[in-house]
Amino acid sequence: WIMGHMVNAIGQIDEFVNLGANSIETDVSFDSSANPEYTYHGIPCDCGRNCKKWENFNDFLKGLRSATTPGNSKYKEKLVLVVFDLKTGSLYDNQANDAGKKLAKNLLQHYWNNGNNGGRAYIVLSIPDLNHYPLIKGFTDTLKQEGHPELLDKLGYDFSGNDAIGDVAKAYKKAGVSGHVWQSDGITNCLLRGLTRVKEAVANRDSGNGYINKVYYWTVDKRATTRDALDAGVDGIMTNYPDVITDVLNEAAYKSKFRVATYEDNPWETFKK
């Protein structure tokens, strides 16, 4: 999965997919009542990027729905996975469940079109703080209560705080999650980070009894780092330059080992060599 980083304006969806992304990451900010408000990152953000592009969250969802609904004039067949980077740092811990409920209602109405031919992309809820695990239950309970448990098949999870792998496993246990887990690891492109924890996550994924199904590394803009991440065995690479990742995947060393994922590839299934 080539994951376009910080896609917060509707116009950027096309831009990143046209460069080779089959997945995008979108920032979600919340108001003081735990309502998802904007798709917005703000300053500081990655080096070489404009941090200030934004939409109202529900408007973005409608644009995203157009881009991922077959038959729509804006449809992009390649775009199959969306990571919502939930900026829950502005919330109190006791608001996490509410944030999950409100997020689910917004997605149900504006993205999934109340289950009536809505967007088809798989969705990952990415949460920066392990203490905010109740967000997951708030979200999943709401989908069930609203009569759409089938949409849980489209839903995955990530804790993005670079916490110890064992601590992340405990948070999922508390949240009642088993499966559909992506594990992120990374740092802003302005800084360097080794692959120690990525390798730990990959080992957990491949152990047969770990909690992780997929591993992605962020934010990768250089060819050398891309090669290192692929050599470590990641499933996804988040990038500001999807074309760079595409180029590396076309190199002889990687062409036979990797391909770009399509809608038919289940993002919750651990890949077995």
Curated annotation (Swiss-Prot):
Entry's transmembrane regions: none
Entry GO CC: extracellular region
Organ and tissue specificity: Expressed by the venom gland.
Active-site residues (renumbered): 5, 41 (nucleophile)
Residue pairs linked by disulfide bridges in the UniProt entry: 45-51, 47-190
Any GO BP annotation: killing of cells of another organism
Keywords assigned by UniProt, alphabetized: Cytolysis, Dermonecrotic toxin, Disulfide bond, Hemolysis, Lipid degradation, Lipid metabolism, Lyase, Magnesium, Metal-binding, Secreted, Toxin
Residues that hold Mg(2+) according to the record: 25, 27, 85
GO MF, one example: phosphoric diester hydrolase activity
Enzyme Commission no: 4.6.1.-
Broad class of where this protein is predominantly found: secreted
Cell compartments where the protein resides: Secreted
Cofactor(s) named in the record: Mg(2+)
Co-factor note (free text): Binds 1 Mg(2+) ion per subunit.
SUPFAM superfamilies reported for this sequence: PLC-like phosphodiesterases (SSF51695)
InterPro entries according to UniProt: PLC-like_Pdiesterase_TIM-brl
Pfam families: GDPD_2
Reaction catalysis annotation: an N-(acyl)-sphingosylphosphocholine = an N-(acyl)-sphingosyl-1,3-cyclic phosphate + choline; an N-(acyl)-sphingosylphosphoethanolamine = an N-(acyl)-sphingosyl-1,3-cyclic phosphate + ethanolamine; a 1-acyl-sn-glycero-3-phosphocholine = a 1-acyl-sn-glycero-2,3-cyclic phosphate + choline; a 1-acyl-sn-glycero-3-phosphoethanolamine = a 1-acyl-sn-glycero-2,3-cyclic phosphate + ethanolamine
Function recorded in the entry: Dermonecrotic toxins cleave the phosphodiester linkage between the phosphate and headgroup of certain phospholipids (sphingolipid and lysolipid substrates), forming an alcohol (often choline) and a cyclic phosphate. This toxin acts on sphingomyelin (SM). It may also act on ceramide phosphoethanolamine (CPE), lysophosphatidylcholine (LPC) and lysophosphatidylethanolamine (LPE), but not on lysophosphatidylserine (LPS), and lysophosphatidylglycerol (LPG). It acts by transphosphatidylation, releasing exclusively cyclic phosphate products as second products.
Family statement: Belongs to the arthropod phospholipase D family. Class II subfamily.
Stated name of the protein: Dermonecrotic toxin LhSicTox-alphaIA1iii
Organism whose genome encodes this protein: Loxosceles hirsuta
